[in-house]
Amino acid sequence: GELLAMSQRGNTITEQNVDYVLALTKEKSSVSLVDIDKELVGFTIQGKPIKPKTLGQKKYVDAIREKMMVFGVGPAGTGKTYLAMAMAIQAFKQDEVGKIILTRPAIEAGENLGFLPGDLQSKIDPYLRPLYDALYQIMGADSFLKNSEKGLIEVAPLAYMRGRTLDNAFIILDEAQNTTPAQMKMLSLIHIS
């Protein structure tokens, strides 16, 4: 029934869909593949729908909608950052938040920025590139730059968050597993009202 309903909605049935329906049936899940397929997070700048593809992604999106703080844990490439960014952009467009802040630790795997060539921006840009790529795909470079110039969307290394007051903001901390205990403590001291 699930696969037929998907087919009738114009979706191509893939091997992944079949495997997924079998897994849902085995789990006796109350959520169907059709329910997951109906969930819409937003659209890319090209008009392509952004939606969860798995039950785990649907639960993640639901948690972001319902909770103030959500931790997304999973292997690389499973859509954690992309879906969170799509949710942030939707919340921003619908005036649910006044600002989007995307941050990640700039120093990963013991690297030291001081030894890299160039100014500070050229040193941190490679660490922030995945965030920019997703932003450009979801909202377009022009819209991002316009909102960035107004201070409504910020992409910055985690170290720049020290001493901030972040009111009415959707904050995404990417690659949180690479934070130090001191950085996590600093995050707990950021004022959010």
What annotation goes with each model-predicted range?
Residues Y82-K150:
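Conserved P-loop
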Residues K51, L55-R65:
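Pre-Walker A adenine-sensing motif
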Residues G1-D37:
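Interdomain "pre-motor" coupling segment immediately N-terminal to P-loop NTPase/helicase cores
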Residues G72:
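Hydrophobic anchor at the beta1->P-loop junction of P-loop NTPases
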